[in-house]
Amino acid sequence: MFDSVKIAWLVALGAAQVAATALPAFNVNPNSVSVSGLSSGGYMAAQLGVAYSDVFNVGFGVFAGGPYDCARNQYYTSCMYNGYPSITTPTANMKSWSGNQIASVANLGQRKIYMWTGSSDTTVGPNVMNQLKAQLGNFDNSANVSYVTTTGAVHTFPTDFNGAGDNSCSLSTSPYISNCNYDGAGAALKWIYGSLNARNTGTLSGSVLSFAQSGSYGANGMDTTGYLYVPQSCASGATVCSLHVALHGCLQSYSSIGSRFIQNTGYNKWADTNNMIILYPQAIPDYTIHAIWNGGVLSNPNGCWDWVGWYGSNADQIGGVQMAAIVGQVKQIVSGFQG
């Protein structure tokens, strides 16, 4: 159990990284798991929410992502910028794979789904997000869906506070986190989980833990270290907690921007007052040229999550190596459930 494992706690992630330790188990209800992400992390969140809807059984959130399986049957750039990628074959694949290569699509009718786009996003714009909404509309319950557009926002993670080094809402550059006067993390979590306690806007009670993304918890294109935010209420194991997975976008991994995605997106503020652990898996730049879906070749120098088939033809299906690693992390964390 968690409190019997020696771990290295980081009060704040600084320039010096504490050596990663084994990923502990926590008293987390396995029926309280969700995921969200930005950009390639948004694509990955949709992949996990669809392919592993039995694991991410509360719901998922997508910030500036696109349709599930989008890049398999059209070149990946069709799924970017602000075009209208075809969802005909991807949606047909969801139906034909249901219950085999992916979990049953019937699950999606029971999941809470949150989607966000910036009206001025030219990297993965509103038209692409609209196609995701249309695709999921074949399976979801519209009463369970929230779709939000922030006027003037670009390709960024939206917050309502000024984190150190963050941008204005109209600026799409590193660290791709911006004060848009919109609490994206809070909006996603409140939609997915329902009513929550007010966030902690002061000093947080919890700590950040680094863990080894190795063995079944790691994969091609993933860094050797991942992170968890654990509120004080979840640390001892006395309280049953929930789990949310927060996925960074391209150029947002720890190797690119340090701890900013972990500290500045606002997830931890909500987790701290709601008995919620936040898991931050980490991708890493990969300069090797790989074959991708649809016959192309591409390297991954921006440390994106795999939404184009870099690491296998089954990248968005059960057993896709990055998804399997993240699911392995989730299953280890919830294995300490005492209910």
From Swiss-Prot:
It is found in: Secreted. It holds the Pfam family Peptidase_S9. This is Polyhydroxybutyrate depolymerase. The active site is at 39, 121, 155. Esterase involved in the hydrolysis of polyhydroxybutyrate, a microbial polyester that can be produced from renewable resources. Glycans are attached at residue 144. Residues 1-20 form the signal peptide. One of its GO terms (molecular function) is serine-type peptidase activity. Keywords: Disulfide bond, Glycoprotein, Hydrolase, Lipid degradation, Lipid metabolism, Secreted, Serine esterase, Signal. It comes from the Eukaryota. Belongs to the carbohydrate esterase 1 (CE1) family. One of its GO terms (cellular component) is extracellular region. The enzyme is completely inhibited by dithiothreitol (DTT) and diisopropylfluorophosphate (DFP), and partially inhibited by HgCl(2) and by enzyme3-(p-nitrophenoxy)propane (EPNP). Activity is not affected by N-ethylmaleimide (NEM) or phenylmethylsulfonyl fluoride (PMSF). GO terms for biological process: lipid catabolic process; proteolysis. (3R)-hydroxybutanoate trimer binds at residue 307. It catalyses: [(3R)-hydroxybutanoate](n) + H2O = [(3R)-hydroxybutanoate](n-1) + (R)-3-hydroxybutanoate + H(+). Optimum pH is 6.0. Its EC number is 3.1.1.75. Disulfide bonds join 70-79, 169-180, 234-241, 250-304. InterPro entries: AB_hydrolase_fold, Peptidase_S9_cat.
